[in-house]
Every structure is written in structure tokens, then in C-alpha cells.
């Protein structure tokens, strides 16, 4: 293997792939369609395994400098308040980072991109969209296009498709994206109001049969802190009305009346999917991140899962670079796809179902189970191993 690894997509999974590959001496070329980084509100939660994977590059230390540490997270009820609080210190024997770290996704991408661009092993093309893919036995060729429509071609040894849920790379290989789309869209309202004095942990999930809410704190651009609140919406609701900041402020006030004291600084609306690619490998074309799997954001798993894909994939490609066979790529497909189906999809779907449970008896039973789990250190650890994504990684490693 002498040609570079090509990477379509300069988001979290793509930049993480590049970062992990250059650390192992493998040259890369990254193609990112956007001419500059996206700064709109996206994911912001990093689980312990992700912090471990990013540690050797120095990114984890920088995340600690710029992010917020959430040592506990909560389940709440809109009427009753706190139901259960889970202390991540129960994972102290399982990880060096027994907490969640919260920092906006675009800041992470910038941290990784800065390190990748500084490497002589990397070339990063911004404003370059991959529009066609061809492959044969010993190489893969991509056609990429600049904003003016000018096209060029480049050969690589392998292509990582990390180009998002609508991945052209995935579509170019006729790989099915199996799953479904939720009927409701999710509204994200970012506010200056501080929920912490009201007893909210930096990450909290509030159950309600009519309108559940997820709240979490991020540093904000000025470091003073912002809170993001996620609400479900009805399919028939008008997009412009949902995004209107005055209406969003009223929605927040219906949830927490005191929030009128804060300012709504951003609103965002997006469709929510639960899908996994039919395969993560087709010859010399590989999938990672949202190109391989998408899920609802409850639990903060999607971004982390893409970085885990990148870490696994880079380790395999580095071995191939040194002359080993490509059998590990088939294992990558088996392991990462299986854990996406069994853990990522199952956990995020369960999270949503828990928050929106309409049956009063079922809701009461779930809340009683949460209280009992949080109060028992052994049960809490077992539950947190799953929600912190440690159990899934351990299970994947057992798949031959």
C-alpha cells in the first residue's frame, strides 16, 4: 500500500480517521465539501472511551481546557422533578475518565483539523465535494468538484466514506441504508438561562407523555455557558413557526417558567433517523460515522460512535500499510455494524421510548426501576457501562 488513504468528509468521523491514521504513519487526503467549518448547534457530549481514544493526540487535554465536565446525569419528570441521578464515578475502575465531557462538535472538529493540517502526511481540501467513485483491484479513484464546478480526480489505496447520512460514497456502492425515520422532528433551543440553580445536572432527560425534553449545558462561544433544550415536534407543525425565537421562548417557559429570564440565542430543527448501512465495506470503499449509521441524539451516542469507527478503522488500515492482509476490514464491518445494531440503535430508541411513555403504569414502573438502579452501586455501574458506551466496545471486541 503506497497510495494515500482518501477520506470523503471532514466532520468528526472523517477528521478523526485522518488524525488516527497520520499518528500511525499513514498518509491521507481529506475532501470536505464545505469551505469552512459548521458552527451551528450539533452534538456536544463525549463519553469516556472517546476521551481515551483522543488522548494521545492531545485533543482530550484541549477538550478539558475548553469543555465542561458532567460527573452526573439525570432522569426527571416534568411534573415531579428529579427521578434518578446517575453518578459516573461508579465507572472509576473502568476508565480514566469517569464522566461526560461537554463541548460543541465544531470545536472538536477544529481541534482535530488543526493537527491534521499541520502534518506532512496529510492534505486537506476544503470546498471539495466527492461526486464519483470508481475502484479496481489495487486502487480507488475519486472525482471531486470545487464550488465553481471544476472537477479533478485522485487515486488512493482505500476510501473512507465519512460524508454524512446522505453519503454519496455509500450510494455510489449501492449500499442500502436500512431503518426508519421518526415522524416527528426535533427542535433544539439554545438559551442563556441557567438551569443549574433549579437542580438540573449538566445533562438531564425529562419524561413527559406530551412533550419530553432533554437539556444539557455547553460552554458557548464566550465560555460563559449556554443550555440546549431538545423538544419533539408534531409532523404538521410549520417549520418557520417552530424556529421563531419568540415562540421558542414560550415553549421553554411552558417547560420552566423561570426560563423567561434568559435569551433564546439559537433554534434548530432536524429530522431524526434510525438507520444502519447494509455493509461497512465494499471492496476498497469503507464507511464510518453517519455514512454508516444514524440515530436519534438522546444519550449523546452518534458523534462518539463515529469516532470509535474511525479509531478501529485506522488501526486496521495502519496494519495493512505495514503489509498485513486486509482481513481486518471484514472484521471492522462485522464488529462495528453489529454493535451499531445491538447497542447504538437499541439504546437510543429505548431512551426515546422511556421519555415519551404514555401509559401511567408503565411510566411509574420505569421510574421506580430508575430509582432502584441509581441507588444500587452495582446496578448503577452495570447500567452506566452500557450508556457510557463501554459495554458496546467490549462486546464488539469479542466478535471474530
How should these model regions be labeled?
Residues 3, 148-158:
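Core beta-strand elements of the Rossmann-like FAD/NAD(P) dinucleotide-binding domain
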Residues 9-19, 23, 31, 112, ...:
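Conserved mid-domain beta->alpha element of the FAD-binding
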Residues 22-43:
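Glycine-rich FAD pyrophosphate-binding loop
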Residues 42, 47-115, 344:
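Active-site-adjacent segment of FAD-dependent monooxygenases/related oxidoreductases
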Residues 114, 132, 158, 162-268, ...:
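Conserved FAD-binding catalytic core of PHBH/FMO-like flavoproteins
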Residues 126-140:
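A conserved short coil-to-beta-strand element within the FAD-binding core of flavoproteins
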Residues 316-400:
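C-terminal helical "tail/cap" subdomain of flavin- and related membrane-associated enzymes
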Amino acid at each position: 500500500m503506497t497510495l494515500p488513504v482518501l477520506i470523503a468528509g471532514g466532520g468528526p468521523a472523517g477528521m478523526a480517521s485522518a488524525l488516527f491514521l497520520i499518528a500511525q504513519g499513514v498518509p491521507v487526503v481529506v475532501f470536505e465539501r464545505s469551505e469552512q467549518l459548521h458552527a451551528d448547534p450539533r452534538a456536544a457530549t463525549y463519553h469516556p472511551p472517546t476521551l481515551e481514544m483522543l488522548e494521545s493526540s492531545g485533543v482530550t487535554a484541549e477538550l478539558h481546557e475548553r469543555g465542561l465536565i458532567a460527573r452526573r446525569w439525570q432522569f426527571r419528570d416534568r411534573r415531579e422533578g428529579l427521578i434518578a441521578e446517575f453518578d459516573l464515578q461508579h465507572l472509576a475502575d473502568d476508565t480514566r475518565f469517569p464522566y461526560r465531557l461537554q463541548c460543541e462538535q465544531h470545536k472538536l472538529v477544529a481541534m482535530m483539523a488543526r493537527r491534521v493540517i499541520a502534518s506532512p502526511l496529510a492534505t486537506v481540501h476544503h470546498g471539495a465535494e466527492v461526486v464519483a467513485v470508481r475502484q479496481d483491484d489495487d486502487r480507488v479513484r475519486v472525482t471531486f468538484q470545487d464550488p465553481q464546478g471544476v472537477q479533478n480526480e485522485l487515486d488512493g489505496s482505500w476510501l473512507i466514506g465519512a460524508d454524512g447520512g446522505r453519503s454519496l460514497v455509500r450510494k455510489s456502492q449501492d449500499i442500502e441504508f436500512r431503518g426508519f425515520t421518526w415522524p416527528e422532528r426535533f427542535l433544539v433551543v439554545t438559551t442563556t438561562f441557567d438551569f443549574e440553580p433549579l437542580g438540573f445536572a449538566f445533562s438531564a432527560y425529562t419524561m413527559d407523555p406530551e412533550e419530553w425534553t432533554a437539556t444539557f449545558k455547553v460552554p458557548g462561544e464566550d465560555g460563559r455557558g449556554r443550555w440546549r433544550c431538545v423538544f419533539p415536534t408534531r409532523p404538521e407543525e410549520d417549520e418557520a413557526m417552530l424556529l421563531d425565537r419568540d415562540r421558542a421562548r414560550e415553549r421553554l417557559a411552558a417547560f420552566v417558567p423561570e426560563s423567561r429570564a434568559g435569551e433564546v440565542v439559537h433554534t434548530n430543527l432536524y429530522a431524526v433517523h434510525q438507520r444502519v448501512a447494509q455493509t461497512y465495506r465494499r471492496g476498497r470503499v469503507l464507511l464510518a460515522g453517519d455514512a454508516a449509521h444514524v440515530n436519534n441524539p438522546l444519550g449523546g451516542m452518534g458523534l462518539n460512535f463515529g469516532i470509535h469507527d474511525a479509531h478501529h478503522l485506522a488501526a486496521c488500515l495502519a496494519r495493512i500499510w505495514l503489509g498485513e492482509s486486509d482481513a481486518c476490514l471484514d472484521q471492522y464491518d462485522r464488529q462495528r455494524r453489529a454493535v451499531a445494531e445491538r447497542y447504538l440503535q437499541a439504546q437510543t430508541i429505548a431512551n426515546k421510548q422511556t421519555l415519551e411513555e404514555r401509559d401511567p403504569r408503565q411510566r411509574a414502573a420505569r421510574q421506580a426501576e430508575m430509582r432502584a438502579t441509581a441507588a444500587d452501586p452495582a446496578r448503577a455501574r452495570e447500567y452506566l457501562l452500557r450508556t457510557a458506551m463501554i459495554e458496546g466496545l467490549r462486546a464488539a471486541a469479542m466478535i471474530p
